[in-house]
Amino acid sequence: MAFFKEFREFAMKGNVVDMAVGVIIGAAFGKIVSSLVADVIMPPLGLLIGGIDFKQFSLVLREAHGDIPAVILNYGAFIQTVFDFAIVAFAIFCAIKLINKMRRQEEEQPKAPPAPSAEETLLTEIRDLLKNQQK
C-alpha cells in the first residue's frame, strides 16, 4: 500500500502534472503545425517553383516485381517534415524567449523593503518619545 501512496504523491506533484499538460498541448500543437505546413505553406511554395507538390518527390530504388513491392525513398515527405520541425522549433524559441523576458522583468522590479520587525518598531517609538520629551 505504501508503494501506491508514494506513486500518488509523485504523480500529483506540480512538476509532473505541468509536464503532462505540456506534452498533451505539445502533441496538439504539432498537429496544428503539420497542417499549417502541409495545407498552407507547401502548396504556395510548390506553386512558386512551378506547381510542384513536395509530397510527391520520391526516388524509386527498386521497381516492384510480382508480389515484391517497390522500394521507394520518399524524400518529399522528409522535406515537409523538416519544415514542420523548423516551424515548431521557431515557435518554441519565441515562446521561451518571451518567458525569459517576462522573468527578467519580474526580477528587475525593485522589491518592497521588508516591514520593520517588532523590535525596530519599539525602538522607533522610544526614539520618538525621547524626541518629544526634549522639546
Swiss-Prot record:
Pfam families: MscL
MF GO annotations: mechanosensitive monoatomic ion channel activity
Subcellular location: Cell inner membrane
Protein keywords: Cell inner membrane, Cell membrane, Ion channel, Ion transport, Membrane, Transmembrane, Transmembrane helix, Transport
Membrane topology category: Multi-pass membrane protein
Transmembrane segments: 10-30, 76-96
Gene3D superfamilies: Large-conductance mechanosensitive channel, MscL, domain 1
InterPro entries listed in its UniProt record: Mechanosensitive_channel_CS, MS_channel, MSC/AndL, MscL_channel
Cellular component annotations (GO), alphabetically ordered: plasma membrane
Family: Belongs to the MscL family.
Reported function: Channel that opens in response to stretch forces in the membrane lipid bilayer. May participate in the regulation of osmotic pressure changes within the cell.
Complexes and interactors: Homopentamer.
Annotated protein name in UniProt: Large-conductance mechanosensitive channel
Gene: mscL
